[in-house]
UniProtKB/Swiss-Prot annotation:
Broad class of where this protein is predominantly found: nucleus
Compartments where found: Nucleus; Cytoplasm
A Gene Ontology molecular function term of the record: mRNA 3'-UTR AU-rich region binding
Pfam family, one: Tis11B_N
Domain of life, per lineage: Eukaryota
Start and end residues of each stretch annotated as Disordered: 308-349
Keywords recorded for this protein, A-Z: Cytoplasm, Developmental protein, Metal-binding, Nucleus, Repeat, Ribonucleoprotein, RNA-binding, Zinc, Zinc-finger
ZnF (C3H1-type) residues: 131-159, 169-197
Entry keyword Methyltransferase: no
The species this protein was found in: Xenopus laevis (African clawed frog)
Tissues expressing this chain: Widely expressed in adults.
Stated name of the protein: mRNA decay activator protein ZFP36L2-A
Length: 363
């Protein structure tokens, strides 16, 4: 009886130890499940863990220890003790290996990141910014020394000072903030104008060169640029040369003086020619500022002989007149004030002032 009872207690003790070992394995599998792992399909969740870590020797030991079911563990007490010891040591080894591996990974990664940062800093020192060495170093100017040395981003002397490439519109527009509230947070580094001394001339906004005309008013080319100011001020214009109209009047005077009895119907006295000459000069002056015309300003109709003239009688001329008393006045000016019609009655208000002394009489 006593042997039977002892064997029963012994079996209960073994079962208790086996359950405790299985609980430890289940706890270890839960810890592995929180870590990075791959799922493993199993039929018995109490015997096999749900997630196993990759490249882990402790999991292999756990699997080898857990493959023996509890019903096969009643043969030897030493085997059970060895199994429990192996499971506990496997748990400790797994945790230690995980910590060692994580520490080594983090250490290598941190060293790699530190190496990359050092390389980036070296590359950043080689690749200069747009404002590199464009301003003088204040500590170097004041004390003659700088704690950054060669790595300083500012110029240590005028020989290291570089010219800064500005935007084309730099300092060409007023700073709205400064001129609105009287303060600008950017200070002297602002890209807009604060004072009149900072104003820069915008590119392409300079004074355009004055156009020099290649042709003068008379149509002849100017060979010197000194005559260009004549085109700018209207008071500097020289009087126009004589035109064909004034020359025509002079030729008409000479013709009347040389040939007093010529076969032409237009015979003007000195007083009438004095009235015509200012009209010709005025017409010539007005045509000087326009496009020059090929024809003279005063055009006369073809002159007719005395026998072909109409019924108008010439008025008595003064004693000093060179005209023939028997000749008749015929034709008209280009304005058409006197027509060559056969009608003896004409309106006196429509005639020009130079013909106001003419009288119309019937045959």
């Amino acid at each position: 009886m006593s042997a039977t009872l002892l064997s029963a207690f012994y079996d209960i003790d073994l079962l208790y130890k086996n359950e405790k070992a299985l609980n430890n394995l289940a706890l270890s599998t839960m810890l592995d499940k929180k870590a990075v792992g791959s799922p493993v399909s199993s039929t018995n969740s109490n015997l096999f863990p749900g997630f196993l870590r990759r490249h882990s020797a402790s999991n292999l030991q756990a699997l080898s220890g857990s493959t023996n079911p509890a019903k096969f563990c009643h043969n030897n007490n030493n085997n059970q003790l060895n199994e429990s010891a192996a499971s506990s040591t496997a748990l400790l080894n797994r945790e230690n290996k995980f910590r060692d591996r994580s520490f080594s990974e983090n250490g290598e990664r941190s060293q790699h990141l530190l190496h990359l940062q050092q390389q980036q800093q070296k590359a950043g020192a080689q690749v200069n910014s747009t404002r590199y060495k464009t301003e003088l170093c204040r500590p170097f100017e004041e004390s003659g020394a700088c704690k950054y040395g060669e790595k300083c981003q500012f110029a240590h002397g005028f020989h290291e000072l570089r010219s800064l490439t500005r935007h084309p519109k730099y300092k060409t527009e007023l700073c709205r903030t400064f001129h609105t509230i009287g303060f600008c947070p950017y200070g002297p580094r602002c890209h807009f104008i604060h004072n009149a001394e900072e104003r820069r001339q915008a590119p392409g906004a300079g004074e355009r060169p004055k156009l020099h005309h290649s042709l003068s008013f008379s149509g002849f080319p100017n060979h010197s640029l000194d005559s260009a100011p004549l085109l700018e001020s209207p008071t500097s214009r020289t009087p126009p040369p004589q035109s064909s109209g004034s020359l025509y009047c002079q030729e008409l005077l000479q013709l009347n003086n040389n040939n007093p009895c010529a076969n032409n119907a237009f015979t003007f006295s000195g007083q009438e020619l004095g009235l015509i000459t200012p009209l010709a000069i005025h017409t010539q002056n007005s045509s000087y500022f326009r496009q020059p015309s090929s024809s003279p300003p005063l055009s006369f109709q073809p002159l007719r002989k005395v026998s072909e003239s109409p019924v108008f009688d010439a008025p008595p001329s003064p004693p000093d007149s060179l005209s023939d008393r028997d000749s008749y006045l015929s034709g008209s000016l280009s304005s058409g004030s006197l027509s060559g019609s056969d009608s003896p009655t004409l309106d006196s208000n429509r005639r020009l002032p130079i013909f106001s002394r003419l009288s119309i009489s019937d045959d």
